[in-house]
Amino acid sequence: MRHRNSGVKLGRTSSHRKAMFQNLANSLFEHELIKTTLPKAKELRRVAEPLITLAKNDTVANRRLAFARTRNAATVGKLFTVLGPRYKERNGGYLRVLKAGFRAGDAAPMAYVELVDREVNTSAE
């Protein structure tokens, strides 16, 4: 019985899953918009949102904890200098998951994951 076991396995070992979500979170924080499969996007919220909440309080201990979870110094820097202050007044809900149709090769449902209130470059103007 898997009572109270939250999270989706996504057909991967625990170490592969951990590395994959670490990489997805790093890409999301770097680019602020990524495209992935819908189940990965939904599960990514459970990894990325607590990191942004952690970044709202800039302490050495929080920076070390964020580095332990992301293993990327550039990501930690952006979290605490850009994203933490940006979401200081927002209580959660930092990510938006938008459905993006189906992948051509295997018809997997795709989704865009973006940070709410990100600066959008409009090239149409």
From Swiss-Prot:
Gene3D superfamilies with a match to the protein in the record: Ribosomal protein L17
Keywords assigned: Ribonucleoprotein, Ribosomal protein
InterPro entries according to UniProt: Ribosomal_bL17 (IPR000456), Ribosomal_bL17_CS (IPR047859), Ribosomal_bL17_sf (IPR036373)
Gene Ontology terms describing biological process: translation
UniProt GO cellular component terms: cytosolic large ribosomal subunit
UniProt-listed PROSITE patterns: RIBOSOMAL_L17
SUPFAM superfamilies: Prokaryotic ribosomal protein L17
A GO molecular function held by the record: structural constituent of ribosome
Span of the signal peptide: none
Family: Belongs to the bacterial ribosomal protein bL17 family.
Subunit note: Part of the 50S ribosomal subunit. Contacts protein L32.
Protein's name according to its UniProt entry: Large ribosomal subunit protein bL17
Lineage: Bacteria, Pseudomonadati, Pseudomonadota, Gammaproteobacteria, Moraxellales
Gene that this sequence comes from: rplQ
